[in-house]
A protein has these predicted regions:
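Short coil/turn segments at secondary-structure boundaries
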Residues: 54-55, 123-127, 141, 433-440
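Short acidic, Pro/Gly- and aromatic-enriched capping/linker segments at domain boundaries
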Residues: 79-85, 394-397
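An N-terminal, globular interaction/scaffold subdomain
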Residues: 41-46, 81-84, 88
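Gly/Ser/Thr/Ala-enriched C-terminal appendages of enzymes
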Residues: 1-13, 27-28, 278-468
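Short hydrophobic alpha-helical runs that function as membrane-insertion/retention elements
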Residues: 181, 273, 294-297
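Buried, small/hydrophobic-residue-enriched core segments of structured protein domains
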Residues: 1-14, 23-25, 61-62, 67-76, ...
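Flexible, glycine/charged-enriched surface loops at secondary-structure junctions
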Residues: 182, 234-243, 269-271, 430-440
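Intrinsically disordered, low-complexity, positively charged segments
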Residues: 1-61
Length: 468
């Protein structure tokens, strides 16, 4: 497409593209916007090497002038986006690119794969951590991830979503995600007996001993050996057994029985961690059943978002600039949900006096919502359903993040993004955060934007009718 734009003399024709999604994975009430800093890093380095251009030349089908154009290519547009870590909802632009058409199209694939993947994993992590009710959750999924990049960037997204740490050491090297690890069954099996394995591990890591106790039998072997280790190895060193991990069996029964026996041995401070195919629903059930669990290691169902492994974000043109004038664009479809909302836009989040989010309003870019006057919300699919709100304040969510070849906002740390997620979640009503059958959060259109969309749809309908 970029080559076609160039050969048609449209290399400097500017457009606006919106990134948004149509439904929340797992029928949830919200999503977490993640991956923005990764996109900005890509934009910063985006260029074409001589080898890449030669490959395109040999492949054929590319205009030589276009190949020369790529030699000096740098992204020359603007990017507007929600803050990374924001809670977001369907059918509102999370990121808008305003740039020459070629620039917009070249960004598309990387932008989609990055924001879709990281938003998916961050959203899944937030759901899982919410069900843990303050207990620590660890990301254990690298070995089941869909490749090395998915493991690495998945760990980043999971940390943003709320996990305490990851078993992916490279994620700490690259992003600063705290790395953790425990022993594997192979370590236990490599010794003559379980106790010898535990003793060797404790001698190596006396300050951080966490034992995997289900290699043979949790209650008849693993736990008794763990208690013996505390008494015979760690206690003489002035150390304490940090924890045990159970990776199989009835986790509710085993954790409760282990807790009883640990407490009876004076090991009330020894934590119990579990793993084994966990997700938000299983964690919720374990806690409701009274399981004595202090932490959860969550693997494949987090790192692959196994229950719904696709975040359906799309990237659509909404405006084209000709002779200095913006011309809104709309795509219609047999499926109503796929009809786009035209024009360069802003998203306003409305908060009540208690700082709880009450609705998002998608408006034309030039509109302002300031809360000084009552404001009427309406359902864009059923405009007769209206509600007037007052005593609120409105926050513009799409902020300029890239201009003139550089980022224009201070780069947040990953810990700051993670903390922002929690502050955002605190603005949502419990009904919106319900695991099942959540209340639908309102995303409305402003009256001028709704009018524009309807006028364009009516115009297209008339053209189609006249063309019959």
């Amino acid at each position: 497409m970029a080559n076609a734009y160039f050969t048609q003399g449209r290399a400097q024709e500017w457009a606006v593209f919106d990134y948004y999604f149509r439904r929340v994975p797992d029928n949830g009430g919200f999503a977490i916007f993640a991956g923005l800093e990764t996109v900005l890093d890509y934009v910063r380095e985006l260029s074409f090497s001589a080898e890449q251009i030669d490959f395109l030349r040999q492949k054929g089908g590319f205009d030589e002038g276009f190949l020369q154009y790529l030699r000096d290519f740098r992204f020359g547009g603007e990017i507007y986006a929600f803050t990374e870590g924001s809670v977001v909802f369907p059918n509102e632009p999370l990121l808008s690119v305003r740039a020459p058409l070629i620039d917009c199209q070249i960004l598309e694939t990387f932008l989609l794969l990055t924001l879709n993947h990281q938003s998916l994993i961050a959203t899944k992590a937030a759901r899982i951590c919410a069900q843990a009710q303050g207990r620590k959750v660890f990301e254990f999924g690298s070995r089941r991830a869909h490749g090395a990049d998915a493991a690495l960037y998945g760990a980043r997204a999971a940390y943003i979503g709320g996990v305490a740490a990851s078993a992916n050491t490279q994620a700490e090297v690259v992003f600063g995600v705290p790395a953790v690890g425990t022993m594997a069954h192979a370590f236990v099996q490599s010794f003559a007996d379980e106790y010898s394995a535990f003793a060797a591990y404790a001698q190596t890591y006396p300050d951080h001993t966490v034992l995997l106790i289900d290699t043979y039998d949790v209650l008849r072997s693993g736990l008794p050996n763990a208690i013996r280790l505390q008494q015979e190895v760690l206690q003489p060193l002035g150390k304490r057994l940090k924890g045990i991990r159970i990776d199989s069996g009835d986790l509710t029964y085993l954790s409760r029985r282990c807790r009883e026996l640990l407490d009876a041995a004076g090991m009330q401070d020894c934590e119990i961690m579990v793993s084994n195919g966990l997700d938000e629903f299983i964690i919720k059930d374990l806690i409701q059943q009274g399981a004595a669990i202090d932490g959860f290691g969550v693997g494949e169902r987090l790192i692959t978002a196994r229950s719904e492994p696709v975040f359906g974000g799309v990237y659509k043109i909404v405006s084209l600039e000709k002779a200095g004038k913006a011309e809104p664009k709309i795509k219609i479809s047999e499926n109503l949900i796929k009809t786009t909302t035209p024009a360069f836009k802003q998203v306003w989040r409305l908060y009540n006096q208690a700082q709880m989010a009450i609705a998002d309003v998608v408006s034309l870019r030039e509109e302002t919502i300031d809360g000084s006057q009552p404001y009427t919300l309406f359902d864009p699919q059923a405009p007769w359903k209206r509600k007037t709100v007052q005593d609120f304040h409105a926050k513009p969510c799409l902020q300029l993040v890239w201009q003139d070849g550089k980022a224009v906002q201070k780069r947040p740390t990953l810990a700051e993004i993670r903390a922002y997620v929690q502050s955002e979640l605190n603005t949502l009503w419990c009904e919106v955060k319900r695991l099942e059958n959540p209340h639908g959060y309102y995303v409305d259109l402003s009256q001028p934007l709704w009018n524009l969309k309807q006028d364009m749809l009516d115009g297209i309908a008339k053209e189609m009718e006249a063309g019959r």
